[in-house]
Amino acid sequence: MEGASRQSLAAARSVLDQVTAVPIGATAGTVAPEVRRIAGDLSAVATLVGGEPTVRRALTDPGAPPQSRTGLAARLLGGQISQGALAVVSAAVAGRWSRPADLRYALEELAVEATLAEAEAADALDEVEDELFRFGRILGQNPQLSLALTDPAAPTSAKVGLVTRLLSGRAHPVTLRLAEQAVADREQGDIERRLEQLSRIAAARRGRVVAVVRTATVLDADQIARLKAAISRFFGRQIQLQIDLDPAVLGGVAVRVGDEVVDGTVLRRLAAARRGLTR
């Protein structure tokens, strides 16, 4: 997303944080149903915005004043979605969007964050983040399973059912819901990358950046601590490590933070040597 869209997403996220916060004296169990409904409502609105070009253009029309766009949202959605979800949608449509399609993607991301807020309230955000990452790695190591979940010819219900059988009772309910949504959304593309993206969103809610570390050997606690400190210093931010065992690395480690790769592996050095020989 470009500047205007990022600012509008940030404004809507601020409202989401307010409507999903656990009130003082309340418990996660008492707020979870409402937060879950907000997440579902935001997902439904994202689907509406994505599937109805006329609605999408009207809700993002830069020529209309913000109050006109929020009024339209209230008329379209009032009484059909929760007050919390409507507040988030109103904040979103009040902003400016670099592209009309960005509103849909923002609402999808906010729906994910609302789902993660439920895990956060239950002090299970770390667990969900790790499970999403691990499930993605399991798919990466099992091509047949990955194909079954991405086969365009397979019914969506069959793919969702497969995820349910794999994770039900083995993962946190929030992890299960997010994984089901990931395989159900045909437009998200690579399911492994989508799961990794969801894991990064979970980490971002805790104010941390995810560093995916590929290594050929198991790292002990001291090595992990030193590596985490070094990467945090390099990027100047708190880092959450996710370790991916990969025999193809051959030695050393390869670190990826978002699209940036810090590669200090034997594999990289061999590749550089090969390039030198071919010149």
Curated annotation (Swiss-Prot):
Coiled coil spans: none
Family, per entry: Belongs to the ATPase delta chain family.
Disulfide partners: none
Subcellular localization(s) per the UniProt record: Cell membrane
Position of the signal peptide: none
Upper classification of the organism: Bacteria, Bacillati, Actinomycetota, Actinomycetes, Frankiales
The protein's name in its UniProt record: ATP synthase subunit delta
Functional summary from the UniProt entry: F(1)F(0) ATP synthase produces ATP from ADP in the presence of a proton or sodium gradient. F-type ATPases consist of two structural domains, F(1) containing the extramembraneous catalytic core and F(0) containing the membrane proton channel, linked together by a central stalk and a peripheral stalk. During catalysis, ATP synthesis in the catalytic domain of F(1) is coupled via a rotary mechanism of the central stalk subunits to proton translocation.
Keyword ATP-binding belongs to the record: no
